[in-house]
Structures are given as C-alpha cells and as structure tokens.
C-alpha cells in the first residue's frame, strides 16, 4: 500500500533564515540530483494545508512516499513462512560465542547453534557488538479519525526532528528527541511526558489549528544512530555479520541493507 504523495519541508517563522538559506541552495541541490531523478527534486510550494505559525512557503519533493508498514511486515512474514523459515519472537539474545565453523547464540533461557549469525537489531545492537551505534528512542502519537482532514503527504519540521503524515484521515506525528537527547539515548521503551506534550502543542498550534482532535495512541520506538549517517554493513568475522545504524531510516533503507548484508556471505 504505497502512496507517492510527496514530502514537504516546513519551517517555523523563527527559522525563516534557515528557509531562505535552503531556498538559495535549491538549484545547486537539484543540479546534483538530476542525473539520478531526470528532473528537479525540490521546488517551492504554497502552504495549501492551513498550517499556522510557519513560513508560508514549503519545500516540496514529489518523490517521497508513504508506506503502510503493518502491511509491509505482514507481506515479509508471509514470504518468510513460504520458505519454511522459523521465527522466534520475544527472545532476548545476551551474547554469542564462535566455535570454529559455527556460532553459539546465547539467550536468557537457552542456547542454540548456527553456521552463520546476522545481527540486524539496529538500536539494540550495542549489547552484542562493540560498534559506534547509539540507541535513540523516538516518541510517537496518532490521532483519532478527523472529519474532513485536508492533509495528505509526509512532512518534516524543525530540521527533520519532527515528522508527520496522514494515515487515511488520521495524523501520525513523531519526533522531538532534540528536546531531551540524553534521556532518549536509551533502548528502553516508554513515554517522555515533556516530548509528548510538545507533540500535542505542535498538533494544536501548527498542524491542526482549525480542527478538533483527540489522541488515540501513543508509543515509542528505538532507532540506531551515530556520528555518521551511513549504515554499518560488514563482516565481524567469517561467521558473524551485521547490518545496523540505520539512522531513523529503517523503513526506507531496510530492504537495501538486508540485500547488502546477504551479499556479505
């Protein structure tokens, strides 16, 4: 269920200097990207969504899309089942030991052996590997259905620290990690009240200033980030490999990283 409704960069009025700097760079960036896309990637659009307290021009990218991640995971699980691959859920791997041509995988309750081990636990990987990766918790909420919602597409706010999109007639909004970096450097799921409150304020004051809305669900997710934006895809040894540090782009680049990881054998 992929929809290419485009992506929009939004700038609050306090960031008007940043918007103007980005606007000045558009031609340069489009020139760099044109060989890949055969047309300009970024253009200026009017604010047609009724957003408030923002610069009244948006930077639009027609190539960004929306994916139903639940349907994506369901399709991947079906594909795995057809190949008779067994999935063990909710098993906490604590360590691994290499034994010549095999790997012993140690969990909280039992151990088992495998000829190869691929580690793709992203933000949880620093429990097993000595790599430059930091867990980063992301706060998310989603509204109940909103009558006559006129917002369609994906949107980035405040240098990308906030992301929102429509899911049918709901708004999903996440981000705000920059409000509390240290507390959110964790692999423990949980809500941060400060950030969740800010997400609601952004909904009320910027995204949906004319709409009544209620929050339906709140949750958190764990990303894997680092000082570099590139993912780590490499062999740790002859039998152990990793594909980690996806930098908050897991849905977008996860399948590519999976292919690269498979090619490591």
Predicted regions: what is each one?
Residues 1-75:
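Flavin (FAD/FMN) cofactor-binding and adjacent substrate-gating region
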Residues 4, 89-91, 217:
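Short loop/edge segments at beta-strand edges and connector loops
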Residues 16, 124-126, 179:
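Glycine-rich nucleotide phosphate-binding loop and flanking beta-alpha elements
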Residues 49-55, 97-104, 225-230, 236-237:
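A short, glycine/Asx- and small/polar-enriched loop/turn
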Residues 54-115:
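Helical element adjacent to the flavin cofactor pocket in flavoenzyme catalytic cores
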Residues 57, 63, 209-265:
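C-terminal catalytic lobe of FAD-dependent flavoproteins
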Residues 95-172:
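Flavin-dependent oxidoreductases
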Residues 149-237:
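Active-site lid/adjacent beta-loop-alpha segment flanking the redox-cofactor pocket in flavoenzymes
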């Amino acid at each position: 269920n992929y929809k290419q409704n485009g992506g929009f960069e939004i700038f609050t009025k306090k960031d008007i200097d940043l918007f103007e700097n980005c606007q000045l760079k558009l031609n340069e960036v489009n020139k760099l990207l044109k060989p890949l896309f055969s047309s300009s990637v970024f253009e200026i659009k009017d604010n047609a969504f009724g957003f408030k307290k923002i610069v009244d021009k948006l930077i639009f990218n027609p190539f960004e899309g929306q994916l139903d991640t639940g349907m994506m995971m369901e399709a991947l699980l079906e594909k795995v089942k057809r190949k008779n691959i067994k999935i063990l859920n909710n098993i906490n791997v604590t360590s691994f030991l290499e034994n010549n041509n095999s790997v012993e995988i140690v969990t909280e309750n039992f151990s088992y052996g495998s000829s190869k081990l691929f580690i793709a636990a992203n933000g949880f990987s620093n429990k097993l590997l000595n790599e430059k990766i930091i867990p980063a918790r992301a706060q998310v909420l989603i509204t109940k259905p909103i009558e006559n919602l006129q917002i369609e597409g994906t949107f980035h706010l405040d240098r990308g620290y906030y992301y929102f999109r429509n899911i049918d007639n709901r708004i999903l909004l996440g981000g705000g990690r920059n409000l509390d970096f240290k507390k959110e450097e964790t692999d423990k799921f949980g809500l941060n009240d400060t950030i969740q409150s800010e997400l609601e304020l952004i909904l009320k004051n910027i995204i949906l200033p004319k709409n009544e809305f209620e929050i339906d669900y709140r949750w958190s997710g764990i990303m894997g980030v680092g000082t570099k934006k590139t993912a780590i895809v490499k062999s740790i040894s002859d039998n152990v490999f990793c594909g980690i540090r996806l930098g908050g782009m897991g849905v977008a680049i996860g399948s590519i990283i999976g292919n690269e990881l498979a090619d490591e054998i």
